[in-house]
Amino acid sequence: TIFASDLAWPTAIVCYDGGVFVGATPEILYLKDTDGDRKSDERRVVFTGIGGSLKRLNMQSLMNSFRWGLDNRIHGTASGTPGKVRVVGKPELGTVSFVRSDFSFDPRTLDFRIESGGAQHGMDFNAAGQKFVCSNSHHIQQVMYEQRYAGANPNFMPRSPLVDIPVDGASAPVFRLSP
């Protein structure tokens, strides 16, 4: 059984309220089976604008890694793809613009915000809620703080919130699994 079809580049998925949020650039959709036939009956575009302004997308830079955070928000990374994200059908919530950032959203209120990160290929949390990201050049980094807190002080110029933490150095061999 195919739960959902006609998705453009689905690269992220997370469960919520009997359905799933799916990241399919430039949209985040909500899909749900409402009649028990294991096929999506409800299909709703919730957010749009992630990479939507680009004429050509880089396959290595698509949104990915939907994860639940300890803050009860769904977190993801937009990789290197810029965004001007808005909630479909709710213009009063405005637009959130970003470049090379991660993001999170509250699935109940649809509050969307920028998060520190900018992972290319992955993002996850450990059991203590610490955030880790990776890319080709930096195969494991820890996100030490959220930029929005440091940015509140105009007299403080913080270092990058990303810290390389691999024991084998900043760049290691990358072994592709896909054909």
Predicted feature locations:
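Beta-propeller domains with acidic blade repeats across secreted/periplasmic ectodomains
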Residues: 1-179
